[in-house]
Amino acid sequence: MRKITLIVIHCSAVRPNQTSSAAQIDEWHKERVTHGIHWKGIGYHYVVRRDGTVEIGRHLADPGAHCVGHNRHSIGICYEGGLNAEGLEVDTRTPEQVRALRELVEKMHTYFPEALIVGHHDLNPSKTCPCFDAVHEYWDLQPVR
């Protein structure tokens, strides 16, 4: 297994009337091309739907494709949403998503207790994703340094 030092939280940047299942994100990512190379598929390891359902993306043993410079040593978790009806980037998590994200992050923390839990914007300041402060939200799970 890879050495995991980060658990990175993302949003899928869709409006309330749009969906983003793991299968849909997989298709979107396969359509992307970087430096002339097509992406292999979904870059996240998990997707948390609005109803709290957790869908599997990439296998945990495989590096993600969700945060430039950090994929080899991180787990990527994406929640469905992140945009309001007007397209503004805001925290749109449902109570079911908040609960499911918490449970999933706690589970990942048991597997990778030394991993920092961060939002995408903590590693790439030009991003607002995931539209909430993941470091603060999961402060009780952060490793003691």
Locations of regions flagged by a protein language model:
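Basic/polar, cationic surfaces and motifs that engage anionic cell-wall
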Residues: 1-12, 50-54, 70-75, 80-145
